Amino acid sequence: MMVALNKTTGDVIWKCSMPESQQAAYGSVVVGKFAGVKQYVQFLPVGLVGLDAKSGKLLWRYERSAKGSPAVIMTPLVSDGYIYSGAFRAGGALVKPVKIHGGFKAEEIYFNIKLPTGLGGVVKVGDFLYGTSGRSLACVDFISGAIKWQESTVESSLLFADGRLYLHAENGEVALVEPSPDGYREKGRFTPPNRPADQGTSKAWAYPVVADGRVYIRESTRLWCYDIKAGK
């Protein structure tokens, strides 16, 4: 179920029950405007869904990028009227919500089981999508779905800031990568010191965060902060 609340009073504005299952997922709700209609989009175990922002009415659903996945984690990426989503053991897909016969449908642009589906999410830089799936980082043409390159690495959460990709891998390593469709260009890599005692049994899943010239890295009970201002 999705619920809209008044941010000041907490009063319920609307509720929308999902078809077949009320199970929640890990990703956040994102907002977009499709065919002139403001919509809230979320990636759930029942699929990618779009709701009318005013009424909460379910406008469309796309199941393929979630079907068969035991863990729907990715926050969908919205850009220029398109939405990318992907889930473990399902695949990655790009859809475009369009009006048809007085309603909406999610028009599939492409689907590929080899596209990024990792829990670390995806980012779009220019015309290209970057994300991990299994043990590889991939660069994908956003509109065509063509894979430009793949590089073997550890599954990572990633962020784009200041012209660079910041990768925080499951094994705790942090890498700095220059985004380019021409190939993998790593600029540096390190492992934070004094990692948690449970590092052998747990995985580092927290996203890196960049703010005010600093990058923040969290793993279990530890938090590291590094100065990344130019010239430092």
What are these regions (language model features)?
Residues 15-37, 43-44, 61-79, 86-88, ...:
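Extracytoplasmic beta-rich repeat domains
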Residues 92, 172, 180, 200-232:
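Blade-level signature of beta-propeller repeat domains, shared across WD40, Kelch, NHL, RCC1
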